[in-house]
Amino acid sequence: MASRNQNRPPRSPNAKKEGLGGISFDKRRKVETQGGTGRRQAFSAVNKQDVTMNSDVGSIEECGKVDFTKDEILALLSERAKAGKFDTKAKIEQMTDIIKRLKVCVKWFQQADETHVQEKENLKVSLESSEQKYNHKELEARTKEEELQATISKLEENVVSLHEKLAKEESSTQDAIECHRREKEARVAAEKVQASLGEELDKVKEEKMAAKQKVTSLEDMYKRLQEYNTSLQQYNSKLQTDLETVRAALTRAEKEKSSILENLSTLRGHSKSLQDQLSSSRVLQDDAIKQKDSLLSEVTNLRNELQQVRDDRDRQVVQSQKLSEEIRKYQENVGKSSQELDILTAKSGSLEETCSLQKERLNMLEQQLAIANERQKMADASVSLTRTEFEEQKHLLCELQDRLADMEHQLCEGELLRKKLHNTILELKGNIRVFCRVRPLLPDDGGRHEATVIAYPTSTEAQGRGVDLVQSGNKHPFTFDKVFNHEASQEEVFFEISQLVQSALDGYKVCIFAYGQTGSGKTYTMMGRPEAPDQKGLIPRSLEQIFQASQSLGAQGWKYKMQVSMLEIYNETIRDLLSTNRTTSMDLVRADSGTSGKQYTITHDVNGHTHVSDLTIFDVCSVGKISSLLQQAAQSRSVGKTQMNEQSSRSHFVFTMRISGVNESTEQQVQGVLNLIDLAGSERLSKSGATGDRLKETQAINKSLSALSDVIFALAKKEDHVPFRNSKLTYLLQPCLGGDSKTLMFVNISPDPTSAGESLCSLRFAARVNACEIGIPRRQTSTKLLDSRLSYG
């Protein structure tokens, strides 16, 4: 259908008024369009002429094929008969020809007018449909405006209650002003939403065209999926058989583990009793050694005394012999007096008496020496017996220690086998794995002196996998894939997920995210303190393992290319943490008001990869490069102070590494993705005391976490529609939660009794996540060149 501008003659600015009573063509055109009857009556005299020529009829029938320009119409209207004054026949012929052309022109105008009328009707219909759509959009806008008004009224009620509580404080006026400003912003936002509805209408039309194109591609994909489904059914039957085998092996492993644990406990008891006996034997040995030393010293003293007595006796005997010799000489010597003889006799008697006393003492010392020697022999025999028993006990202890080491080694191997079988079962079931970690009590915790609310089961089945929370006297038991108590180190935590991180190098999509209330230790678990080697978090340790493993696989012909990106979702706005243009506080204000200069868009391609437009991507080849990027991202991330946490994360942090591996010898290529996510913590306004910007951040965080909860509940119920688009966080995590990825969730809880309610909510959410079956992850391998663009899974 020709448009109105195409049928309208062009207007010349130099055209003068001429013909038909001096009325210009444009004016006459305007008058004619006001009523159809007036325009048709203008040439009624011409139309009533009795023209019966066949050529006239043919000309009128062919008028629809003739187009007139403005100059031709003006020339036709100004044309006059050129015949002589008395040449009536020629005048009639000329007038007849002019009338024919005028009829053709009139017919052309009538058809153009009909075209315009039809176009007008179409425009009316289009206008009515547009008005209906506009009314519908306006109704939606009014509904949203009413919701915003309800939110505003709730906020006003909160302000009134706060005003009553804080009437004596000077900050009440500022709170009222802040509330009024939020009300104005909400109204402005409602107006913007109303204005954006028109733009959304255009987008819907564009999406409709794109949907038609997708339908064609989806039909082709459906055929391929049918073929793939057949192969999957065959593979599933094989997996079911393997699953039964694995379950039987797991049962045997559990029984062997139970018997090993029983033997281990028996051996530990026997070892403890032997250690007690060894300790008592060592005490007896020490006493015997001390007694032996005292006896040896006593024997030495007695021997010295005996030797001294013997020496004295020998001197006395020699002296007695000398005196006897002198007596004999004196007796022979007649010249000596009897007095001297008596003196010598007395001396001899005293010496003999002293000698007898010395003999008695010597006999006594010999008896004591014999007794001491006997006691020494007995002590030597006791020490020898004790030493023999000690050697036997030591040998038995070594044997028990060797058996204990063997049992512990078997236990470790059994535990590794159990983990491997458990991971295999989980992969076959397609469940999201959940680990729970309890942080230690801090000096600032309010319930530090109250009774503990966290307990760990000691049964064989639940040991290391169960956690009990006590609230208001009620015990709530939970079981997860692994539970870390408050004494668990960063190394122990990473050891449990190291095999999952390794899967990214094998071509799988891996996603690990931390969930919990604010201040429960999520950021410490994911990032830790990189400056302290023993306190590094999962992200630095995962990167170190990936680079070490890639270097080891280099000997097998593998070459890897790694790309990283880091972003945060702050107030439902994506921010690039590695952008060279550092975001300022004014940019944050513009981002809050929805006027940010740079917008990032999340898209999913047909291969299941997720891309974020205009996101900064770095090629990395060392841990040092990534460490500097992590430090840059940590400095750019949004943090703030609340009453619950001095350094509270106010955004969701997403670290992504895409790994592309090529083995030239086998011509095999793999493509893996590692997503490590530190979610912002949920918090209650009554405890965090958030106001102003902190209040907006809290509302945005709780909204996105609520959207994540809705997605998990929909997956758990196996609903047809899963609301991934309700927030940017869930839309970004769609591939990770959609069944094509190995996904692990860390739920962090606080042992503080004042946070028992939040901890219970977190544990219940984690239990629901653990029950979700999202499908079996697939390994991304190919023999073609890979796309080098970064994706999020």
UniProtKB/Swiss-Prot annotation:
| Gene Ontology molecular function: any one | ATP binding
Instruction: Indicate where this protein resides in the cell.
Output: Cytoplasm, Cytoskeleton, Spindle; Cytoplasm, Cytoskeleton, Phragmoplast; Chromosome, Centromere, Kinetochore; Cytoplasm, Cytoskeleton
Q: Which GO terms describe its cellular component?
A: cytoplasm; kinetochore; microtubule; minus-end kinesin complex; nucleus; phragmoplast; spindle
**Keywords tagged on the record:** ATP-binding, Cell cycle, Cell division, Centromere, Chromosome, Coiled coil, Cytoplasm, Cytoskeleton, Kinetochore, Meiosis, Microtubule, Mitosis, Motor protein, Nucleotide-binding
Q: Where is the composition biased (Basic and acidic residues)?
A: 15-32
What Gene Ontology biological process does one annotation of this record name? anastral spindle assembly involved in male meiosis
Q: Which residues form a coiled coil?
A: 120-375
- SMART domains in the cross-refs: KISc
Q: What is this protein called?
A: Kinesin-like protein KIN-14C
Give the organism, scientific name. Answer: Arabidopsis thaliana (Mouse-ear cress)
